[in-house]
């Protein structure tokens, strides 16, 4: 049984919908290779997956991009209850589940892990050190298209009590917003629709995302009058006459 088998999406958690919503990358959709992916826990007890990507930029050069995707809260739940009163998967879980489906044909809950030693940053030593971690090995080396957003926020600093709060200083960072299939350029919802209708996926959301977000910096910076304020919290017919069925996720599981 895999370490994510208890994190299955139940029927009362809403399916995702396509909504627009090192060096800093400009907002764009990038051809991306998954170098490594491993799971660990924050001190709070929340579980995350750290993914190292190799991003190909428009000029053909490549850049490493690391991101942590929080897949549970500290109670081990994969969902939150939205303003609509419905359960929604955590954004980090949603992206990782889509990433797993698009690259392996299996959900995050179906992924197996292997212990491997990776070079991981150790804050106490101030450098990367060999560390044994639980790796999602089936993701290693797989390609995806990743919608990356450039964001402007307040830089957070520790106050006297050690709590992190917003400062006046601005910072720019990148966050993954959506995952697209490298072959079809389609999202998981688009592929699900195609499979239900036994047709090839129609990739339309990718152009909508680009039209709204390409080159746009999402400004979440808050003006601070004096001192610091409370921290910002926030961080996709066969031969025998039977009808053929388009199974994109299924064939990637083999």
Regions found by a protein language model. Name each.
Residues 1-254:
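Short beta-rich binding modules
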């Amino acid at each position: 049984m895999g370490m994510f088998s208890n994190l299955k999406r139940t029927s009362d958690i809403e399916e995702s919908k396509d909504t627009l919503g090192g060096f800093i990358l400009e907002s764009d959709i990038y051809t991306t290779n998954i170098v490594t992916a491993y799971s660990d826990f924050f001190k709070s007890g929340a579980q995350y997956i750290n993914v190292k990507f190799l991003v190909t930029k428009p000029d053909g050069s490549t850049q490493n991009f690391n991101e942590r995707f929080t897949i549970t809260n500290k109670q081990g739940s994969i969902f939150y209850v939205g303003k609509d009163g419905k359960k929604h998967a955590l954004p980090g879980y949603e992206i990782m589940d889509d990433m797993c489906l698009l690259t392996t044909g299996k959900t995050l809950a179906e992924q197996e892990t292997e212990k491997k030693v990776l070079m991981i940053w150790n804050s106490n030593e101030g450098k990367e050190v060999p560390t044994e971690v639980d790796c999602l090995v089936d993701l290693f080396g797989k390609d995806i298209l990743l919608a990356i957003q450039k964001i402007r926020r307040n830089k957070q600093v520790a106050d006297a009590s050690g709590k992190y709060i917003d400062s006046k200083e601005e910072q720019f960072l990148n966050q993954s917003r959506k995952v697209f299939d490298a072959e079809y350029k389609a999202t998981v919802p688009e592929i699900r629709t195609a499979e239900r209708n036994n047709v090839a996926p129609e990739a339309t959301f990718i152009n909508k995302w680009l039209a709204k977000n390409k080159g746009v910096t999402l400004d979440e910076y808050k003006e601070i009058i004096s001192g610091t304020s409370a921290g910002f919290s926030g961080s996709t017919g066969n031969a025998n006459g039977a009808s053929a069925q388009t199974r994109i996720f299924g064939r990637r599981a083999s």
